[in-house]
Amino acid sequence: MTIAKPDETIVKEIEEQRPPFPAGLLSRQEKDRIIERCIRALYRWYTVRSQESRNWHPDSSFNWRALRTDHSPELNTVIEGFFAIEQYVPDYTSKATHMMRKSYGRSQYQLRWGAEEEKHADLWLNTLLFLRFRTPEWIEDYMDFLRNGEWQLPWDDALHLTFYTVIQERATQLNYLNLELIAMGKSDKPGFTNSADPVLVKAAKTIARDEAAHFNFFLELARLYLYYYPAQALEALVEVIKHFGMPAMHLLPEESRFAEALYQGAIYGPRQYTRDVLQMALKNLGIPNRKAIDEGIKRSRQVPDPDGNMRDTVIVDALDYHAVETAVMRLFDRVRKHEEKIGLTEIDPTYFVPSGITIEG
């Protein structure tokens, strides 16, 4: 039987649709390059979105003179604690930036993140000043004391730090969302009732939106690692969960009083962490629950595909790999649209590359 040569127009159409990357198993270097490239593109998308939708200032965006000055000691303790945590922004920013300095996207984003956290520090400083339960002199002395301490990174590699930050950013967002409810007068907890304050509502809402944006950025990074390095990423996530703690708490002289106020106000505690932080983060990562992630990975091995190429076959107890893949593809599509809008697709486009990994189980 003679096989007819396909029409040239059909051949041309197929070639035009061929992805600009080789098929087959990706090397570690290729995976790292793809991840880095996507992070860079995501960072650039993020900065545009940030300036368009969250362009506020801690001095001029709030009517600080209208802030109540008769809040309860318990609520004042919470505000003072938030102020204290933000005094370590120079450490949060500089140490992570230094560790990520070889990654353009990660280091550039960390600088942007630090600029946004700087606004949070100024916001809580203004809040503490206008609450008037502490004198400016006391606040100045307390700030000096706090800044004599130094926070250290909880992990010294990008993979672990990514998953740590996913959980931490969601926890921080939840703190501010629950503070917003208190400031709306919706709390029935002793020491937090009758706390309605429109200025504090706006402050908590504004900063919670920033934390949501931070959470979503690091969530996208975590999905990239889960997609291209599922076994290693899950192992890192398990380790982070086992050792997780909120940053800089141990550096506060009133750590126990602050933690107790958060707990009594139902702002943040073990229940909120398990139900509203960890479970929510795991769900967004394609993992149904804590028990599933604790079971970890059964085995990871390489097997030949039908063409004889060796591919990773990762058997995972509870990772919805297809959902992760869909989310990663959606991310690449988002940054592609951004690059199209500004013209980068004509010069240096970012492409999605399939991982080539098969998930069984």
Predicted regions and their residues:
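Non-heme di-metal
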Residues: 2-361
